[in-house]
Amino acid sequence: MTSPASGDDYAPIPRSALGPALNDQGYYVGRVERNLYYVTDGVYQSAFLTTPDGVVVFDAPPSIGHNLRRAVDQITAAEGMPNTVTHLVYSHHHADHGGAAFLFDGDVTRIGHEETRRLLLRDGDPARPVPEVTFADRYTLGRR
């Protein structure tokens, strides 16, 4: 029989491994590069890209939920860019990555792999609307 582990059995977690400090609303938004940002609640992440035509959001975890919208509004206001979310890209179909996708309704175009679409149709979850645009191997969004 084994005994349960105690706090003395593990090395302390280094402060740098804890991630960035969250604001009073429970999220942190950081710049990856130029107009690409990430948002975290300390567990899950999302990302968004600001453009002159609007914002492209990558994943919408329910644990971040409305804070994702707040982060988009905060950054676009500071950068003088439009805050309209025009596209939402699903990384995959799991609810822990797309469960707040319903918050971005209206004219948003949802993009996902064709298998993501199939699985979202199967699941029938209204919080995760099915992507209108799908791809098999790759998809390019925007002008080239």
Regions found by a protein language model. Give the residues of each.
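A general marker of short, structured functional hotspots
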Residues: 6, 23, 33-34, 100, ...
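Intrinsically disordered, low-complexity regions enriched in small/polar residues
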Residues: 12, 29-30, 39-40, 50, ...
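Conserved beta-strand hairpin/beta-sheet module of binuclear metal-dependent hydrolase folds
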Residues: 26-74, 79
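Active-site HxH/HxHxD metal-binding segment of metal-dependent hydrolases
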Residues: 20, 67, 73-143
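Hydrophobic small-molecule pocket/channel-lining residues, especially in calycin-type beta-barrels
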Residues: 8, 64, 128
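Alpha-helix-centered segments that form part of catalytic cores
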Residues: 25, 29, 35, 132, ...
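N-terminal pre-domain segments of enzymes
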Residues: 1-26
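Phosphate-binding glycine-rich loops and adjacent basic patches that engage nucleotide phosphates
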Residues: 9-11, 28-38, 98, 125
